[in-house]
Amino acid sequence: MGLSDGEWELVLKTWGKVEADIPGHGETVFVRLFTGHPETLEKFDKFKHLKTEGEMKASEDLKKQGVTVLTALGGILKKKGHHEAEIQPLAQSHATKHKIPIKYLEFISDAIIHVLQSKHPAEFGADAQGAMKKALELFRNDIAAKYKELGFQG
C-alpha cells in the first residue's frame, strides 16, 4: 500500500504548511481529537481535567503535546514509508507504557485531515487529502504490526 513519488510530494508539500505553525496545528488537532472523542482524554493524565474547548486552548501542556506529536509525525512522513527506526520506539511506548489503541490513532489521523482541510482548503484538495490519508494509514498499519509483535491488542 505504498505511496507513489507524486503522492509523497503532495504529503510533504502539505506538511510544510504544518511545519510553518506546528504549535497552532498541534493545538487544533488535539482540541479536535478531544472534543470529537472525549474518551481519548482518559489516556492523558495531564489533560483529563480539561472539559471545555476554552480550557483545552488555554493549556500549555496541550500545546506542548501537539508540538511533540506533530514533530514526530513529520519526521516519520519525511521518511516516505522507510520509517522502521522511528516506528519501533513509538510503537513500544504507545503499546506498553501509554496503551494507546489503534482506534485512537485513527481518530487523531481524522483530526489531522480535518484540521488541514479547515486551515488550508486551497492547498489541501482531493489529491492531497487522498495522499495524506494513505500516508497516515501506512503509519497506522505499521504501528499495528509492531503492536502485534509486542502482544498488544490495541
Swiss-Prot record:
A GO term for molecular function: nitrite reductase activity
Modified residues (Phosphothreonine): T68
PROSITE patterns reported in the protein's UniProt record: GLOBIN (PS01033)
Gene3D superfamilies documented for this protein: 6.10.140.2100, 6.10.140.2110
GO BP of this protein: removal of superoxide radicals
Domain Globin: 2-148
Reaction(s) catalysed (UniProt annotation): Fe(III)-heme b-[protein] + nitric oxide + H2O = Fe(II)-heme b-[protein] + nitrite + 2 H(+); H2O2 + AH2 = A + 2 H2O
Group of enzyme by EC: oxidoreductase
Entry annotated with the keyword Oxidoreductase: yes
Binding site for heme b: H94
Protein name: Myoglobin
Organism: Elephas maximus (Indian elephant)
